[in-house]
């Protein structure tokens, strides 16, 4: 597993790089984990419906090829893109989603933030509020896209959408529980727990 820390990047640029990586990899290519933040952007998943974008203001909307509905990415949110040959690892996509949820819960529990999952609504929650989203794409047995964990960000753009297609879905973030939390520290813990699941 190769880990890349990419800093803050434009969504469309990284999306194109993910597609190119996935299209050109072969059975000997190492899996990769890309860690980054994005400049403010709304992304629509393949199941996304226009009516879930309520008031985008000046924030760009990108129609993506990942699974799921609309979400928001912005600075202070840890994004981890999972470029993995799940066929080689004998993993089903649902199993991968469950493992990613477990990793996110482990990270949150490390900070003593009680997290849970909800049936029929992928992602991770603190109480009824969503703290992390998951959206993947599989092509030729290989995944791209990944997770987004709200660490210490401006949550107000989520008010301009129905996050993940759920009206009035409330969002939260780790800084509500730890005001001085640093994204770099959270990223390190995410990698640690990720590598315990995926060598």
Curated annotation (Swiss-Prot):
The active site is at 164 (acyl-thioester intermediate). It is found in: Cytoplasm. Pfam families: LplA-B_cat. It comes from the Bacteria. Substrate binds at residues 66-73, 133-135, 146-148. Its EC number is 2.3.1.181. GO terms for cellular component: cytoplasm. One of its GO terms (molecular function) is lipoyl(octanoyl) transferase activity. SUPFAM superfamilies: Class II aaRS and biotin synthetases. Belongs to the LipB family. This is Octanoyltransferase. It comes from Legionella pneumophila (strain Paris).
């Amino acid at each position: 597993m190769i880990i890349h820390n990419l800093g803050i990047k434009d969504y469309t640029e990284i999306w194109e790089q993910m597609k190119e990586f996935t299209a050109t990899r072969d059975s000997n290519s190492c899996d990769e984990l890309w860690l980054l933040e994005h400049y403010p952007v709304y992304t629509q998943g393949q199941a996304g419906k226009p009516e879930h974008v309520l008031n985008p203001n000046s924030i760009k909307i990108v129609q993506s090829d990942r699974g799921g509905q609309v979400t928001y990415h912005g600075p202070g949110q840890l994004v981890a893109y999972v470029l993995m040959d799940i066929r080689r690892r004998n993993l089903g996509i649902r199993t991968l989603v469950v493992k990613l949820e477990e990793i996110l819960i482990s990270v949150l529990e490390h900070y003593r933030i009680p997290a849970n999952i909800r049936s029929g609504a992928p992602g991770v929650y603190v109480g009824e509020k969503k703290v992390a989203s998951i959206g993947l794409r599989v092509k030729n047995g290989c995944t791209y896209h990944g997770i987004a964990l709200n660490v210490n960000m401006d949550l107000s753009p989520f008010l301009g959408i129905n996050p993940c297609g759920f009206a009035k879905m409330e969002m939260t973030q780790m800084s509500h529980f730890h005001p001085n939390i640093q994204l770099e520290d959270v990223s390190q813990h995410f990698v640690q727990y990720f590598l315990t699941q995926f060598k």
